[in-house]
Amino acid sequence: MQKNKIKTFSIIAHIDHGKSTLADRILELTNTVSKRELTNQFLDSMELEKERGISIKLNAVQLKYKDYIFQLIDTPGHVDFTYEVSRSLAASEGALLIVDATQGIQAQTLANVYLAIENKLEIIPVINKVDLPSADVDRVKQEIEDVIGIPTNSAIEVSAKTGFGVDKLLDAIVEYVPSPLDADDLKPLKALIFDSYFDPYRGVVLLIRIKEGKLKVGDKFMFMSRKHDESNTYHVIELGVKNPSETKKEFLESGEVGWVSAAIRDAKEISVGDTITHIDNPAKEALPGYKKIKAVVFTGFYPIDTKDYVQLKESLEKISLSDSSIVWEQETSKALGFGFRVGFLGLLHMEILQERLDREYNVGIIATAPSVEYKIFKTNGEIEFVSNPTMMPDRSTIEKIEEPYIEATVFIPNEYIGNLMELCQSKRGIYISLEALDDKRSKIVYELPLSETILDFFDKMKSYTKGFASFEYELIGYKESDLVKVDILLNGEKVDAFSIIAHKDKAYEHARELCIKLKDEIPRQNFEIPVQATIGGKIIARETIKAYRKDVTAKLYGGDVTRKQKLLKKQKAGKKRMKKIGSIEVPQEAFLNILKTNTDQKNKK
């Protein structure tokens, strides 16, 4: 295979700018998929992706155009899946930057461009949706030059929906995307694992980009991140390329993107970003991997039925295979039993995983309220990281608490600037800068505590700006905050699943909300139940679940009032005794409804 005929590129764009539709048109025009077989969002293989209209997983396909071989790697566009994008870019030489002609540059476009520049990729600007009446191509071109600094004289104007301009785009890929000319089949094998997925019959299937060397069926290989021994020896059973369905081959050459099956059964044996090499002629050094991504949102996952605990563990193992950004460990809760503490890249990421567990693995779960990882400085000089409110050390042993902060960049129409600033202030934001992009839009930068943005910030921002704002963030480190742990007591008993960590100024507000929610959800008992929120033993909010009362005076008619009072007194004493020994059963539905995040409640409306 001639190396100068290989063109490997990724498609990057903000969510909803037409990335998957353009991928469909490219598949159609290169005759990779016939029009009859082509469905919308063809490369989005998960049902969930098609339903929500978003890409979640990356996908890699080999196509033929004239006498060239195109290797297209489709990427997600949502801020939570930036890690998937960075992996695709590390396996590419070029990137198509898609910008919606009606919306212009959005926050996520910018984030992905910086990733492409970091990876030293050739970027081709593509202006999509030019057929729409509201398209303003000249303004968007100007914006690309001003904000990103890429010349737009070679920008391609297309309509992914109708197919207009896509043929010009294919020629531009041939002209501008570099070929892997340094790829050499004779050098020792170096192949980058940029993704993996689980097949119930073949085990783990690796998606690789061969940078140097050649890989054949029957070859023995190893992972370079681990020492070579018996447990790090694998045989290639099958390999091939995707176009878009799997096509088997006898070998893969340098420069190619393909898949490899080697009867790998354990998900933990693989880390995405690793390099594979031959055992008999190993490479001297591994390829530069990816910077390890850190989970930022943590939540407890507990099976609804305790019998499903093992199944939940196996499902998490399988999902972590294709999504190496998830971290999880076992934990227990007095109220919910055995479960796992799971770390995610963001709330959408968490929601998607919950749905995947339910659909693909048939495991129903209760998720506790999401939280972030706090840095606790103790009086004895120790530093502890805590993501679970129940693990918070005693207040008397804490010197100070720091929480993670993000730098949020928001692109917004000028008329909504006031609304957005008001929202950021209410979330304890620190104003950094405001920059006008043109006479219609501006870029605002704020520093915000991550804990304030993980619940409802995104939804509120959309409603404050009628859906026109776009948001992108990066972690900038930890800052000291005045944080407290709020515990919930039911009938004087602490319920660990409802504990939260909140800022002192907002603790009362959160505690009050939670008490009211609990009062509405927990069924009435035969005795009165106090629902209390406490900070370090001090009660800050209270609600009461009223008791059922039997009408003990029904059998009386007439007579002295003292007879009535005597019976009521007797009932009161009985209830008091019952309250002392009565334990409260919190039904499963109550847990589910109380612990549901705002997104779930919004969907219910």
Swiss-Prot record:
Organism of this sequence: Mycoplasmopsis synoviae (strain 53)
Residues engaged in binding GTP: 16-21, 128-131
Protein localization: Cell membrane
Source species taxonomy: Bacteria, Bacillati, Mycoplasmatota, Mycoplasmoidales, Metamycoplasmataceae
Catalysed reactions, semicolon-separated: GTP + H2O = GDP + phosphate + H(+)
Molecular function via GO: GTP binding; GTPase activity; ribosome binding; translation elongation factor activity
GO cellular component: plasma membrane
Topology with respect to the bilayer: Peripheral membrane protein
Keyword field: Cell membrane, GTP-binding, Hydrolase, Membrane, Nucleotide-binding, Protein biosynthesis
Keyword Transcription appears in the UniProt entry: no
Chain segments annotated as transmembrane: none
Gene3D superfamilies: 3.30.70.240, Elongation factor 4, C-terminal domain, Elongation Factor G (Translational Gtpase), domain 3, P-loop containing nucleotide triphosphate hydrolases, Translation factors
Domain tr-type G: 4-181
Protein name: Elongation factor 4
Function: Required for accurate and efficient protein synthesis under certain stress conditions. May act as a fidelity factor of the translation reaction, by catalyzing a one-codon backward translocation of tRNAs on improperly translocated ribosomes. Back-translocation proceeds from a post-translocation (POST) complex to a pre-translocation (PRE) complex, thus giving elongation factor G a second chance to translocate the tRNAs correctly. Binds to ribosomes in a GTP-dependent manner.
Keyword Cytoplasm in annotation: no
A Gene Ontology BP annotation from the UniProt entry: positive regulation of translation
Listed EC numbers: 3.6.5.n1
Family, similarity comment: Belongs to the TRAFAC class translation factor GTPase superfamily. Classic translation factor GTPase family. LepA subfamily.
